[in-house]
């Protein structure tokens, strides 16, 4: 699975050449989920994006502070409530242009909540990058 992450990360990197950014952030996993999975798929995708943009990657700046139920296990309408207040930012991002990377966007609840947290900490702009987008059922 990591090889696929590297492949898709390189494909994302090819698409971002025109983006101006100060920082690349992968959507964080809760530490418990990271331990059980063994890797953060968003981080693996974000590495080549950071390299292509020639800007830093910071996987520790934004943290998942609540171990939420897996979004994929929930009905669409329950996902926003499940992810609410699940993220925390550890430093001020005033004026920073952020690229937030994840693997799949379904309802967008996780990315939206993380972006909300980044904006509350001063991010000037946030570009969301995902490998895949699922369509409503």
Task: Give the predicted meaning of each segment.
Residues 1-100, 107-137:
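Conserved PRPP/pyrophosphate-binding segment of the phosphoribosyltransferase/PRPP-pathway fold
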């Amino acid at each position: 699975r990591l090889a696929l992450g590297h492949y898709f990360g390189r494909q994302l990197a090819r698409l971002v050449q025109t983006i101006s950014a100060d920082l690349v952030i992968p959507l964080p996993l809760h530490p418990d989920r990271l331990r059980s999975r063994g890797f953060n798929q968003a981080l693996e995708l974000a590495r080549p994006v950071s390299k292509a943009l020639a800007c830093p990657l910071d996987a520790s700046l934004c943290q998942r502070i609540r171990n939420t139920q897996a979004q994929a296990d929930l009905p669409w309408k329950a996902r926003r409530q499940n992810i609410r207040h699940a993220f925390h930012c550890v430093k001020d991002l005033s004026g920073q242009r952020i690229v937030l990377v994840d693997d799949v966007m379904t309802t967008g609840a996780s990315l939206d909540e993380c972006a909300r947290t980044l904006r509350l900490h001063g991010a000037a702009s946030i570009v969301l990058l995902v490998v895949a987008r699922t369509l409503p059922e």
